Amino acid sequence: MAIGLKEKYKTTVTQSLKDEFQYKNVHEVPRFTKITINRGLGEASQNAKALESSIQELTLITGQKPIVTKAKKSIAGFKIREEVPIGIVVHLRKDKMYSFLEKLINLTLPRIRDFRGISPRSFDGKGNYNLGLREQLIFPEIDYDNIDQIRGLDISIVTTAKTDQEGLALLKKLGMPFRES
């Protein structure tokens, strides 16, 4: 599964981007560095089961066990204390990254209700793309009967692109379904 997207990048996308942006060297062509999947869990401080179920879901989705993020300092307004779990994060690189990206493009995004494409405006100015999903049910690994609550997650696709236009071209050529705006 991961071989398809990685091979497509190496064979067709690299040469296409090199011609489009007039790069002198193949190593100048933008590539993927990592994909970060993050889920904030505000209720994890009161509900340990929410943390465990989220860890299990993200492990199923990514194939890698997430890291538990903890609060750096206490904030009374948010009712959190220092070192209390407040979220989970997974960093995907190399083959797992390409496998997840292929699954996201071909299986997951088309399962979103009334899906017309993702926004091309979610770039950060340096060629990295951020995507927020409202529910985990769109992933094929998640069974509807086994979830306790619908939770969203954030996906950051980090590239070596210098500008948003380069990042957009890279993702479009790999088949990311962007909305026409």
Swiss-Prot record:
Keyword Ribosomal protein annotated: yes
InterPro entries reported in the protein's UniProt record: Ribosomal_uL5 (IPR002132), Ribosomal_uL5_bac-type (IPR020930), Ribosomal_uL5_C (IPR031309), Ribosomal_uL5_CS (IPR020929), Ribosomal_uL5_dom_sf (IPR022803), Ribosomal_uL5_N (IPR031310)
Gene3D superfamilies (UniProt xref): 3.30.1440.10
GO biological process, one term: translation
Pfam families tied to this protein: Ribosomal_L5, Ribosomal_L5_C
GO cellular component, one term: chloroplast
Localization of this protein: Plastid, Chloroplast
Gene Ontology molecular functions: rRNA binding; structural constituent of ribosome
Record keywords: Chloroplast, Plastid, Ribonucleoprotein, Ribosomal protein, RNA-binding, rRNA-binding
Alphabetized SUPFAM superfamilies for the sequence: RL5-like
Disulfide bonds: none
Family according to the record: Belongs to the universal ribosomal protein uL5 family.
Function: Binds 5S rRNA, forms part of the central protuberance of the 50S subunit.
Subunit organization: Part of the 50S ribosomal subunit; contacts the 5S rRNA.
Name of protein: Large ribosomal subunit protein uL5c
Species in which this protein is naturally found: Pyropia yezoensis (Susabi-nori)
Encoding gene (name): rpl5
